[in-house]
Amino acid sequence: MMQGTCKISSIEKGALKNLYVVKMDCDNDLKIEFDITKELSIFSKDEEVTFIISREKPEYSEKDFCAHGYLFLERQQEDGSFIDEISLYGLIVKILSKNGLINSKLFKMMDHVYYCVKKKA
Protein backbone atom coordinates (compact mmCIF):
# COMPACT_ATOMS: atom_id res chain seq x y z
CA MET A 1 0.00 0.00 0.00
CA MET A 2 1.07 3.56 -0.66
CA GLN A 3 -0.54 6.65 0.82
CA GLY A 4 0.20 10.28 1.48
CA THR A 5 -1.00 13.85 1.75
CA CYS A 6 -1.33 16.09 -1.30
CA LYS A 7 -2.38 19.57 -2.33
CA ILE A 8 -4.31 19.96 -5.58
CA SER A 9 -2.15 22.27 -7.69
CA SER A 10 -4.42 22.49 -10.74
CA ILE A 11 -7.53 21.17 -12.43
CA GLU A 12 -7.37 21.51 -16.21
CA LYS A 13 -9.64 20.52 -19.08
CA GLY A 14 -8.59 17.24 -20.64
CA ALA A 15 -8.34 16.34 -24.31
CA LEU A 16 -11.80 14.74 -24.37
CA LYS A 17 -15.20 16.31 -23.73
CA ASN A 18 -16.22 16.42 -20.05
CA LEU A 19 -12.78 15.19 -18.92
CA TYR A 20 -10.52 16.99 -16.45
CA VAL A 21 -6.94 16.37 -15.36
CA VAL A 22 -6.30 16.89 -11.63
CA LYS A 23 -2.66 17.55 -10.69
CA MET A 24 -1.44 17.09 -7.13
CA ASP A 25 1.81 17.83 -5.31
CA CYS A 26 2.31 15.26 -2.56
CA ASP A 27 4.63 14.29 0.30
CA ASN A 28 8.14 13.01 -0.53
CA ASP A 29 8.41 14.90 -3.87
CA LEU A 30 5.64 12.77 -5.32
CA LYS A 31 3.45 14.19 -8.09
CA ILE A 32 0.19 12.63 -9.20
CA GLU A 33 -2.00 13.47 -12.20
CA PHE A 34 -5.33 11.75 -12.76
CA ASP A 35 -8.25 11.95 -15.16
CA ILE A 36 -11.72 12.54 -13.79
CA THR A 37 -15.01 13.09 -15.58
CA LYS A 38 -17.01 16.27 -15.12
CA GLU A 39 -19.73 14.33 -13.27
CA LEU A 40 -17.22 12.99 -10.74
CA SER A 41 -15.19 16.20 -10.33
CA ILE A 42 -15.52 16.92 -6.61
CA PHE A 43 -12.21 18.66 -5.93
CA SER A 44 -11.03 22.28 -5.85
CA LYS A 45 -7.67 23.88 -6.56
CA ASP A 46 -5.49 24.22 -3.42
CA GLU A 47 -7.59 21.64 -1.56
CA GLU A 48 -5.67 19.29 0.74
CA VAL A 49 -6.42 15.61 0.23
CA THR A 50 -4.99 12.19 0.98
CA PHE A 51 -4.41 9.47 -1.60
CA ILE A 52 -4.28 5.71 -1.28
CA ILE A 53 -3.05 3.11 -3.76
CA SER A 54 -3.76 -0.37 -2.43
CA ARG A 55 -4.38 -3.96 -3.48
CA GLU A 56 -7.13 -4.12 -0.85
CA LYS A 57 -10.32 -2.06 -1.06
CA PRO A 58 -9.88 0.86 1.38
CA GLU A 59 -12.59 2.52 3.41
CA TYR A 60 -14.04 5.63 1.80
CA SER A 61 -17.17 7.78 1.83
CA GLU A 62 -19.43 9.30 -0.82
CA LYS A 63 -17.34 12.50 -0.56
CA ASP A 64 -14.23 10.71 -1.86
CA PHE A 65 -13.12 9.53 -5.31
CA CYS A 66 -12.28 5.84 -5.36
CA ALA A 67 -11.88 3.51 -8.34
CA HIS A 68 -10.05 0.33 -9.25
CA GLY A 69 -7.96 -0.76 -12.18
CA TYR A 70 -4.52 -2.03 -13.15
CA LEU A 71 -0.94 -0.79 -12.82
CA PHE A 72 0.15 -1.22 -16.43
CA LEU A 73 3.29 0.86 -16.97
CA GLU A 74 6.50 1.96 -15.29
CA ARG A 75 9.26 3.76 -17.11
CA GLN A 76 12.40 5.51 -15.96
CA GLN A 77 12.95 9.05 -17.21
CA GLU A 78 16.26 10.61 -18.24
CA ASP A 79 16.65 12.29 -14.83
CA GLY A 80 16.37 8.90 -13.08
CA SER A 81 12.85 9.42 -11.75
CA PHE A 82 9.96 7.10 -12.61
CA ILE A 83 6.50 7.43 -14.11
CA ASP A 84 3.94 4.78 -13.23
CA GLU A 85 0.52 4.60 -14.85
CA ILE A 86 -2.68 3.02 -13.60
CA SER A 87 -5.69 2.50 -15.86
CA LEU A 88 -9.00 2.90 -14.06
CA TYR A 89 -10.91 1.35 -16.98
CA GLY A 90 -10.14 4.32 -19.21
CA LEU A 91 -9.26 7.03 -16.71
CA ILE A 92 -5.48 7.26 -16.31
CA VAL A 93 -3.48 7.97 -13.14
CA LYS A 94 0.17 9.04 -13.54
CA ILE A 95 2.49 8.86 -10.53
CA LEU A 96 5.83 10.65 -10.80
CA SER A 97 8.31 9.52 -8.12
CA LYS A 98 11.99 9.05 -7.37
CA ASN A 99 11.80 5.26 -7.00
CA GLY A 100 8.77 3.92 -8.90
CA LEU A 101 6.02 1.68 -7.55
CA ILE A 102 7.35 -1.47 -9.21
CA ASN A 103 11.06 -0.70 -8.89
CA SER A 104 10.62 -0.15 -5.13
CA LYS A 105 8.77 -3.50 -4.87
CA LEU A 106 5.52 -1.95 -3.58
CA PHE A 107 3.56 -3.39 -6.51
CA LYS A 108 3.99 -5.67 -9.52
CA MET A 109 3.16 -5.04 -13.16
CA MET A 110 -0.57 -5.61 -13.83
CA ASP A 111 -1.48 -5.64 -10.14
CA HIS A 112 -5.17 -4.93 -9.59
CA VAL A 113 -5.21 -1.80 -7.40
CA TYR A 114 -7.59 0.66 -5.81
CA TYR A 115 -6.86 4.37 -6.23
CA CYS A 116 -8.61 6.74 -3.83
CA VAL A 117 -8.40 10.47 -3.27
CA LYS A 118 -10.02 11.36 0.02
CA LYS A 119 -11.14 14.77 1.16
CA LYS A 120 -9.84 15.95 4.53
CA ALA A 121 -12.49 15.80 7.24
UniProtKB/Swiss-Prot annotation:
Give the protein name, as stated in the record: DNA-directed RNA polymerase subunit Rpo8
Q: Organism source for this protein?
A: Sulfolobus acidocaldarius (strain ATCC 33909 / DSM 639 / JCM 8929 / NBRC 15157 / NCIMB 11770)
Record's superkingdom?
Archaea
Main enzyme class: transferase
Known catalysed reaction(s)? Answer: RNA(n) + a ribonucleoside 5'-triphosphate = RNA(n+1) + diphosphate
Q: Which GO terms describe its cellular component?
A: cytoplasm; DNA-directed RNA polymerase complex
Q: Does the keyword Nucleotidyltransferase apply?
A: yes
Q: What is its main location?
A: cytoplasm
Sorted alphabetically, which HAMAP family does this protein's record hold?
Answer: RNApol_arch_Rpo8
Whom does it interact with, and what assembly results? Part of the 13-subunit RNA polymerase complex.
Q: What InterPro entries does this protein's entry cite?
A: NA-bd_OB-fold (IPR012340), RNA_pol_Rpo8 (IPR031555)
Task: State the EC number(s).
Answer: 2.7.7.6
A single Gene Ontology MF term assigned here is:
DNA-directed RNA polymerase activity
| Gene that encodes it | rpo8
- Function, as annotated: DNA-dependent RNA polymerase (RNAP) catalyzes the transcription of DNA into RNA using the four ribonucleoside triphosphates as substrates.
GO BP term, example? DNA-templated transcription
